[in-house]
Amino acid sequence: RLPRILGALLVGLGLAVAGAVLQAMLRNPLAEPYTLGISGGAVLGVALCLIVPFLSVARFSMPIMAFIGALVSVIIVYAITSRHRFSVSSLVLSGVILSFICSSLVLLIFSVSKPTEIQSMLFFLMGSFATIDYPIIKVITIPLIAGVLILVFFSRDIDVLTLGDEKASHLGIAPHRVRAFLFIITSLITGCCVAVSGMIGFVGLMMPHIMRSIVGPKSRNLFIA
């Protein structure tokens, strides 16, 4: 039971911090990895990992494929919204559309998979900590904790981004570069979480609001809480 408890704590930590970062830098209270398509891309990467023979054999290929899927989703959404001068509404809309596309591709993978593969993928998509063991904990702990510490280090920049791109530029911060870097870190964290627990939605949406009502809106205090 101890690996599952540790896994639940790590996944909750990762999703909550990723959601808090996305809500702050996008200035949108509904932003989180699930609604922006990051979780959908990670799930698609894991689904591909489960059906490709040489990937399914490797034990630690799931976190890698989940990170790649999440990163590709972020790149697609970022490329679409950059044409509209990075409108927050267009970013959220693009993320939701991409999430539906990823879900459709996962269903397409289901239709061409074997019954045993479908069973394992359905069990994974429902979200579960039953298969977590110590080797998996060791694999995800280092990148997840490192990602959270990096976000804590950039907490001041995240707070400045909440003022808007123009004011952030006047304060010596390059908004687009910082935002792109933060997207990569949140993709890494989300990929690690999805790889071990499957699709768990709305943790990254609810927890930042709950903790914000307790410790306030400052990013450093919010991440530590």
Task: Please identify what each model-predicted range represents.
Residues 1-225:
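Alpha-helical transmembrane segments in inner-membrane proteins
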